[in-house]
């Protein structure tokens, strides 16, 4: 195995094509579980017939199973196949169970504290590795203590730096992503101290650094100087030929300059980072007004998906995206 984990990227950015390509090189290929029905024309068509939340979940589980089976077939028995599940998604438990039943090698969970991941994977602990995504040592300690009560330990911990990663970020606010408590070297040192205090030093739980691992020097520093066991890389894989995203998405991402990257609050109530496209720019210009008029109303979501546990638009959360 090479010490590289391909980050999970949705919707449909990392599915079977990308994850199998990474696995074939003896890395960890990761399928993003969110709303995979969009990659399957028959499932997308079916979802428009008498739509319901339950039907969307069922169809997404079917799509997830298809993606896992195709990844396994195309990986030729090499590497590992992981499934990324967002805790913020309402039906996260269903996707975790489907991933386990479909034969995924690992579950990676972020976008919220994965405190109950051991319960969700009951019966599969010998077969499926568990990788929580966290950003600082306090959260790592909380998760470890909770999991230890269930007799379960993480098979690895992904430490994601909110100032450098893309997608949803593990900070309380946009302003907080640059807090010194998230610095990799500090978090690793503090995490080793947490291991010591909990009597886990001998377990040698691998730490995987995620965020900004964009060149060899950064990877080498993480592995050689800081004590990380591997790195997680997302954006660099997203724009590859093997990536599952639309070509226009890849061109936009690959062509973005540093000044085009912007932080904002996602509809899930978490800080996020992305490219300032025309669509996002129009939203950001109107954000203050939209947030000032936030109100709880399930009808405000035109798709009626009810897909998130907490939704800025549906629940009228003024600090989240509308």
Regions found by a protein language model. Give the residues of each.
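Conserved active-site-proximal phosphate/metal-binding subdomains
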Residues: 5, 154, 164-184, 188-204, ...
């Amino acid at each position: 195995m090479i010490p590289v984990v391909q980050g999970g990227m949705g919707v449909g950015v990392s599915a079977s094509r990308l994850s199998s390509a990474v696995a074939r090189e003896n890395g960890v290929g990761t399928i993003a579980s969110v709303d995979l029905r969009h990659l399957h024309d028959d499932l997308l068509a079916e979802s428009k017939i008498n739509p319901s939340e339950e039907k969307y979940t069922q169809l997404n589980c079917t799509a997830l199973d298809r993606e896992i089976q195709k990844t396994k077939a195309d990986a030729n028995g090499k590497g590992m196949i992981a499934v990324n599940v967002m805790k913020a998604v309402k039906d996260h438990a269903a996707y975790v169970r489907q991933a386990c039943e479909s034969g995924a090698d690992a579950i990676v969970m972020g976008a919220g504290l994965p405190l109950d991941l051991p319960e969700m994977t009951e019966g599969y602990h010998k077969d499926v590795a568990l990788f929580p995504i966290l950003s600082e040592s306090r959260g790592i300690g909380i998760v470890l203590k909770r999991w230890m009560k269930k007799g379960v330990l993480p098979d690895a911990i992904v430490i994601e730096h909110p100032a450098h990663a893309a997608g949803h970020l593990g900070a309380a606010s946009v302003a907080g992503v640059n807090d010194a408590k998230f610095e990799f070297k500090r978090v690793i040192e503090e995490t080793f101290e947490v291991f010591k205090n909990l009597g886990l030093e001998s377990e040698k739980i691998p730490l995987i650094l995620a965020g900004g691992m964009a060149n060899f020097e950064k990877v080498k520093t993480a592995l050689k100087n800081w004590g990380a066991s591997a790195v997680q890389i997302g954006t660099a894989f997203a724009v590859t030929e093997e990536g599952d995203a639309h070509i226009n998405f890849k061109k936009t991402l690959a062509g973005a300059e540093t000044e085009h990257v912007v932080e904002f609050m996602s509809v899930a109530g978490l800080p996020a980072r992305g490219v300032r496209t025309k669509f996002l720019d129009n939203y950001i210009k109107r954000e203050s007004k939209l947030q000032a008029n936030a109100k709880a109303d399930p009808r405000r979501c035109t798709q009626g998906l009810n897909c998130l546990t907490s939704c800025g638009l549906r629940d009228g959360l003024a600090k989240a995206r509308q």
